[in-house]
């Protein structure tokens, strides 16, 4: 199951990601995190004993067994050290695989040798040639995008980090040679490379992931230097932040949400928590994290929304909640959030109170800081986004999409309303490079729909027209997102209840090119101009020049290899 996706723009990833190093400082940090988890487990055990009673022999025996297990460090238990001497591990190329050390466990070239004839045991490391080959395999080029996909399989969750290479050159000799081609290294060498999508590395997550947000800020640094991190929100109330430029990392770089205060040690039991009704907790979330939004203007600020009905603004330097807002959505779940594209003080949120809120976080009085626009009474807002600096889009649990103009007074009727799906909206995306392009998906349906909607005239109430509807064989659709760079302006990823991730270039479809002809031409002209400024040639500027382009979808199969699906004739059965 792919439950959330996001993109990393070109140029932010380290070209050669570093390998995880288990030094003394890292060991101390891990020990602190492990102790918190152990305290959590002990508190859970005490709670279970208190509820079950000591008179139940079966429950007592089970509790004693659990207590004995707690004496074994969780990090060591997976290695089965108690039965280590009883196991026979096959000798592989003169040594055994190293599994004791997180920084070495995933390296098949690192071997442990017992030693012969009284010699001391030792570890053999890869030679310089092997290291260079591995370094090249991990290389991320400046022209590559990363795709972040939150995946759950067999009750275990991961964040998969994909590399998307849009390719180079053109197979067709009809594509004209243009000024600036000689300055592009790939084109100058005559290199022709097809698009490719593959898994670079992955991270194991503590709970089912609900959202993922890319950060260009180095957490805990107080630095303006660009970085490459990901924040993951799950059914747990904490937010984990990981460095995407580090491979084989065992623990996150930062956890937002006061893990100690938010652990079972301090929140003894759910019953006591409900009875006490402590009110607004300002330091951390107490329920699932439903959405996050990184502020591109104030880069040390991350907003999060939760099923605990609050919106929190996090300081990424200290890891603390700088502000907590509890009354924006009338004590209802806050499901979605996004910062304004031009104003870093304005936060857009949607909630289960049927309202969209536009909040100025600089205002201290919560009763005066938000303006509201409402969907139909009883509908729950599932997702919100800016289509432009003045137009808001929101999707609801009944399958409706609403458009509001923030220049109108609050509580005004929507500019238009669209019955997009018969089930609740799970994903709603607006393409920031192609004005008026919108994609939708529903958690109870298997199709992704592409729409064209009026954007330049706020008085146009005609509403969107569907360009196409397509089943990508991902099961019920849970997530989709458009690429963040102009060179891949028409590319989107799609995920659903099936574990495969699909990548689709929408402009390889003839109907899409026809519907957005002028918008595509404008993007191509702009991309060409931007490429020439940096001495390169634009690939998108010369794409889609003929009408016989195959409709292309890239699929990642079970082995993590990409397969390219091509629909002949540039048509598709599900076309509108």
Swiss-Prot record:
InterPro entries: PWP1 (IPR044285), WD40/YVTN_repeat-like_dom_sf (IPR015943), WD40_repeat_CS (IPR019775), WD40_repeat_dom_sf (IPR036322), WD40_rpt (IPR001680). It holds the Pfam family WD40. The keyword Phosphoprotein applies. The keyword Transferase does not apply. Residues 46-58, 71-91, 558-576 have a biased composition (Acidic residues). WD repeats lie at residues 207-252, 284-324, 329-369, 376-414, 420-461, 472-514. Residues 41-134, 530-576 are annotated as: Disordered. The modification Phosphoserine is found at residues 52, 131. One of its GO terms (biological process) is rRNA processing. GO terms for cellular component: cytoplasm; nucleolus; nucleus. Keywords: Phosphoprotein, Repeat, WD repeat. Residues 108-120 have a biased composition (Basic and acidic residues). Belongs to the WD repeat PWP1 family. Present with 43800 molecules/cell in log phase SD medium. This is Periodic tryptophan protein 1.
